[in-house]
Amino acid sequence: PTALEADEGGLRVGLLPRQFGDLHELQGGEHCTRTVWFGFDRDAAALRQRLTGYHDPLSATCEPSVYSHSQAIPYLPAGDGGYRDELRVILQEALEGDRSFFSKREAIDEYGWRNYGDMWADHEEAYCPDERRPVISHYNNQYDLLYGMLIQFLLTGDRRWWQLADPLARHVIDIDLYHTERDKAAYNGGLFWHTAHYHD
């Protein structure tokens, strides 16, 4: 929740609260999914442990080679994909260092209800004067980064790929999918391409 209020009369949880200084805009076809957990346990240590399980749940995975040998995902290579060294460097930079996806999320403080999980399209600053940076724009999964992250997770077993893919998937499901049957058939249920490029 983004707001909590408590008094003698009860507890109020704000998911899109009025205390926010602006509007919460949901465009046609968008969803906003929230989960709220209540724990009324007087044992603070037990409650903390239970919440840890919610925030970082156990997940069962296989050795990366099992996925490729199963052929459940067509053309999934075995091992590390046989990548050239140049590609390995790019993939490593996606996870570590100042230009990693994690660092970019921190740089623009991308933790809001609408865009958390989406990736900053920082390449759109290319023609922008320094005084107008950062230009906040998003990929909206237009190049299927989600698929790439999930494939890297399966190939490497590196949980950081999952830590990026999971919130991106949740963002795509709520914001980037056009949840309607009232538009043209070609658009209904498809991806909502709503990025304006190269301007702030």
Region roles according to the model:
Residues 1-200:
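Catalytic cores of extracellular degradative/oxidative enzymes
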